Amino acid sequence: MDLKAQVQGFMAKKEVQLSDELAEKYGVPPEEVAGVVNSFLKDTYGPAIRLAQDIDGKVGVVLLFIGRKDCNICRRSEPILESFLSCHKDLELVKLDYSQSSGLLYHMIHGRENGMLPLIAFIFQGAIRMIFTGECLHAAIYEKYYNECSQNIYVH
């Protein structure tokens, strides 16, 4: 799954959805509200888009962790994640708080309006190799996904 394509697809879908909703609400053609919608989307999702572009340009494997400070599941997952990362210095951690504007990357990657936190993704050269959401209480789970991700990386 290509990160850049996911972001572009999400933004295109949002643009159509919001344009249609506003057009229906105000009884105007969608083209008439396109400028307002584009401005809103740029302001709202801009930080997440820029972050996705940064991640896309990275050479090594990125482990993306999107959680929330007040999420107990996220907090329980963090020490396990840190332990896993201490054994895998080749990974670059990108840790986001879902409540921040860059945390909207969650929806761009996950593709749904709602879901479970945290979201954990292994991304290599702009390709999302593995993604999972929810509680992760064992380093073996990270290890499993890391190994699958590594196999996929070296095959391509």
Q: At which residue positions do the language-model features occur?
A:
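Non-catalytic, surface beta->alpha helical segment in thiol-disulfide oxidoreductase systems
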Residues: 3, 113-156
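Generic alpha-helical secondary structure signal
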Residues: 31, 79, 139-143
